[in-house]
Amino acid sequence: MKQYKLIDNALGWLTFLIAAFVYCSTIEPTASFWDCPEFIVTGYKLEIGHPPGAPFFMLVANLFSHFASNASEVARMVNTMSALLSATCILFLFWTITHLTRKLILKDWSE
């Protein structure tokens, strides 16, 4: 069981690193089309977005926008945040799938 947890954690973090690399290497350095610029601006200025809101996204985007050296880098930082949060989602999805698969396949968890 200890060996399984070690391998599961290592593969999960490897999956995160691969996803983060792919997402961060393909981010849009500026504001793109549709809702993306609106979310970037509402995160940077903490203004009110359109009705769905996404307040957690805006608060975290505001945190990441403080790492920008100037205002022209805000879009890159918010898009980097989106890439890292998406990679984190893939990490937890991997761990969820392996947990459920192990639970379905094995009758006894000590195997």
Each language-model region and where it sits:
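Transmembrane signal-anchor helices characteristic of membrane glycosylation enzymes that use polyprenol
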Residues: L6-F33
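Juxtamembrane helix-capping/reentrant segments at transmembrane boundaries
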Residues: Y44-K45
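Short hydrophobic/aromatic helix or loop-helix immediately within or flanking a transmembrane segment
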Residues: H50-E73, T80-L84
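Membrane-water interface at transmembrane helix exits
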Residues: V22, I27, A61, S65, ...
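Extracytoplasmic catalytic/substrate-binding loops of multi-pass membrane glycan-assembly enzymes
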Residues: I27-F39, G49-A61
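Transmembrane-helix motifs of polytopic, lipid-linked glycan transferases
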Residues: W13, L17, T80-W109
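Membrane-interface starts of transmembrane alpha-helices
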Residues: I7-L11, N70-M81, E111
